[in-house]
């Protein structure tokens, strides 16, 4: 059996702004569920039939804002494989999202990075090869 990430659950301040970000990056994403949990907190599943992001409304404000790559425990970014990173970049740039792409050149892949409205970093990668040894080359 192939292992895959079925979903990720992220607590956010503004669910609707996050939905807009995700649907800008992935126009095929749909709202799978939008409701209020037993604790009175809104949560939404946005994605496809096979993968999604669960967005949960923040109920407690953190002492410090999370900053990706700060060296503190937490998720630095989530990465999605896409067919064409240039289209994703164009869509996100047109919508005003912050491009955080670091210089990266590789013969077998192209990567871009963007911040969502919550300050989380997202990676989008396009592979130019179907060969695992080339896709997994980190030189």
Question: Residue spans of the language-model regions?
Answer:
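Core segments of cupin and vicinal oxygen chelate
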Residues: 2, 9-52
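Vicinal oxygen chelate
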Residues: 1, 4-14, 32, 44-47, 65-139, ...
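Short, small-residue-rich loop/turn micro-motifs
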Residues: 50, 57-59
């Amino acid at each position: 059996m192939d292992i895959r990430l079925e979903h990720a659950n992220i607590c956010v301040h503004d669910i609707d702004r996050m939905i807009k970000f995700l649907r800008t990056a992935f126009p095929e994403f749909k709202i799978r569920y939008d409701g209020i949990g037993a604790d009175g907190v809104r949560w939404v599943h946005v994605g496809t039939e096979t993968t999604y992001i669960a967005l949960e409304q923040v109920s407690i404000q953190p002492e410090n804002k999370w900053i990706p790559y700060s060296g503190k425990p937490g998720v630095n970014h989530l990465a999605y494989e896409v067919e064409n990173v240039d289209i994703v970049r164009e869509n996100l740039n047109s919508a005003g999202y912050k491009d955080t792409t670091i210089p990266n050149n590789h013969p077998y892949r192209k990567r871009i990075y963007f911040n969502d409205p919550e300050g989380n970093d997202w990676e989008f990668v396009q592979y130019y090869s179907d060969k695992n040894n080339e896709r997994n080359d980190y030189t």
